[in-house]
């Protein structure tokens, strides 16, 4: 989980080889990487006005009971999970779009946001359904033919690595 969060470059200051979502390269072993929350994460998660604290199990330290964030982190990072009788997949959204959408909602206006992907690609959101059950999105690559023997791939679809794309072409 921490590798996934660190690769998104939003909450974690990363040190070491964290891998690359574009190429599919894995991260180094945990003993070779370091992580700490960045200033943004500390501000949105550990805010004195929104975070409730309780004593730890041995009473020596305080720990948060919950982390009510001041930012829609699930939408920014995206998440996928299953449980008994249900499943979900929330695609990642653009940071700036989320800030602008949050401001609109706080102003009492409607906001429309769509998924945005770190690796690029085109997305068809005609059946997105604003998060309601059954919505779908289609993700496509941008491929241009430069010559008879050469193609240029401008964007790679979300979830596809350059390594797996090369393997599928060869």
Predicted regions and their residues:
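Gly/Lys-enriched N-terminal cap/neck module of very large, oligomeric protein machines
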Residues: 136-170
